[in-house]
Amino acid sequence: MSNFQAALDAYKNGDLIIVTDDANRENEGDLMLLAEKATTEKVAFMVRHTTGILCVAMTQERARALNLPLMVEVNQDSKKTAFTVSVDYKPGLTTGVSAQ
């Protein structure tokens, strides 16, 4: 089995995987998890062992349906990463970032 296939199988099973990009892009790794397999424990691990910024991939249509505008109107980032405004909300929580 190839490393790619092993990672894909682990991802489908709900395991955390690290995906790295090219040295000519950001030269970094992203800790990824299939959203439907997320648990409080896995999200807490991601928050603790990364920058704490969690991203969710979605289509432009879905972002619009959720009323999530782009973070900036004129994207000057060299990679043109299309971040929306940040969301961190759960009723009853008052401490900021939470894995719940």
Positions of predicted regions on the chain:
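Catalytic domains of riboflavin
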Residues: 1-100
